């Protein structure tokens, strides 16, 4: 990012005595995220002229009257969100035949913070998987996904930027623990269900 504060006269709006642009390097080059314009006393002068009311401030100590100036920041949410997506998007080479698409969003921006993925749709796992989902969904935006293979589900969550995936497997029924996979490193930890909230709370912003 950079700030461009030098503009030719024909680049300025008629009301602006100076403008600073916050710019981001998009794939097509530098472009504006936000503009901050010094509108001077243009707005209040216009209001005064058309309303017939005096709009000014009297400084008693200096015995002076003056019209306040207006600074106008203008930012677009769409373009800023697009910049976040561009900065986070990566196609990572795993090996000669495998490329992983991952959206490395800051966890605060990720649509889902956690996804619960039962290893199988078999009835033996479903109740426990839903218990785990109920445990996390009240604290973080969470997704529940049981369709296709576990690898394809990991890939889907990587593509939408989910920081943590929780896999409920058949060992969970015995050891009361789940596998937690971190998005960026793909590292996995075995975490007891009764410690899961603490584990995630240490790694996800509140």
Task: Please name every model-derived segment.
Residues 4-206:
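NTP/phosphate- and nucleic-acid-binding module
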